[in-house]
């Protein structure tokens, strides 16, 4: 799967909006993930005690983790598909240490699309959403291949 230059432009254009508030976007995305798929919360010992959206919004640790997640994803997106070096340690930790199933990466991808659209409706129309979906699918496909190399059937 390959994205065109125009698609990468759309992806990176919206990502510039994310970078204006990485932690805030990340927190919103994680809250959306945990509310929509409560089972994902079980993978995070640090956040298991957060039961309500208000508790999640008040959590500095959740905000910090959102920043970490989106900083890593931004680094991958900026490589425009040439992300082998960035993907390898991420796949290693998510497969062997955290044991994060690929399905959960699909869930967070959906949360990313939803939050970007809700925060930036004018800049994140159908074409930009399609491009971001494609970029996130490429990321998931490549991380799934790394999982397989590591013997993780996530």
From Swiss-Prot:
Pfam families xref list: Globin
Ranges where the Globin domain occurs: 2-148
Modification sites for Phosphoserine: 4
Residues reported to bind heme b: 94
Classification via InterPro entries: Globin, Globin-like_sf, Myoglobin
Listed EC numbers: 1.7.-.-, 1.11.1.-
GO MF annotations in UniProt: heme binding; metal ion binding; nitrite reductase activity; oxygen binding; oxygen carrier activity; peroxidase activity
SUPFAM superfamilies (alphabetical): Globin-like
Keywords: Cytoplasm, Heme, Iron, Metal-binding, Muscle protein, Oxidoreductase, Oxygen transport, Phosphoprotein, Transport
Binding site for O2: 65
Catalytic class of the enzyme: oxidoreductase
Modified residues annotated as Phosphothreonine in this record: 68
Listed transmembrane segments: none
Catalyzed chemical reaction(s): Fe(III)-heme b-[protein] + nitric oxide + H2O = Fe(II)-heme b-[protein] + nitrite + 2 H(+); H2O2 + AH2 = A + 2 H2O
Binding positions for nitrite per the UniProt entry: 65
Entry keyword annotation includes Cytoplasm: yes
GO biological process per UniProt: removal of superoxide radicals
Gene Ontology CC annotations of this record: extracellular exosome; sarcoplasm
Cellular compartment(s): Cytoplasm, Sarcoplasm
Function (record text): Monomeric heme protein which primary function is to store oxygen and facilitate its diffusion within muscle tissues. Reversibly binds oxygen through a pentacoordinated heme iron and enables its timely and efficient release as needed during periods of heightened demand. Depending on the oxidative conditions of tissues and cells, and in addition to its ability to bind oxygen, it also has a nitrite reductase activity whereby it regulates the production of bioactive nitric oxide.
Subunit structure: Monomeric.
Family: Belongs to the globin family.
Name listed for the protein in its UniProt record: Myoglobin
Species assigned in the record: Balaenoptera acutorostrata
Lineage per the UniProt record: Eukaryota, Metazoa, Chordata, Craniata, Vertebrata
């Amino acid at each position: 799967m390959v994205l065109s230059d125009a698609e990468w432009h759309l992806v990176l254009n919206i990502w510039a909006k994310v970078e204006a508030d990485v932690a805030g976007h990340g927190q919103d995305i994680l809250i959306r993930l945990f509310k929509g798929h409560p089972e994902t919360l079980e993978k995070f010992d640090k956040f298991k005690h957060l039961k309500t959206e208000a508790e999640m919004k008040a959590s500095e640790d959740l905000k910090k983790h959102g920043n970490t997640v989106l900083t890593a994803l931004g680094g991958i997106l900026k490589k425009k598909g040439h992300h082998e070096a960035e993907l390898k340690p991420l796949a290693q930790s998510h497969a062997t240490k955290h044991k994060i199933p690929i399905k959960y990466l699909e869930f967070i991808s959906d949360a990313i699309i939803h939050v970007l659209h809700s925060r930036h409706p004018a800049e994140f129309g159908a074409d930009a959403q399609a491009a971001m979906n494609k970029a996130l699918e490429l990321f998931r496909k490549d991380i799934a291949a790394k999982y397989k190399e590591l013997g993780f059937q996530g």
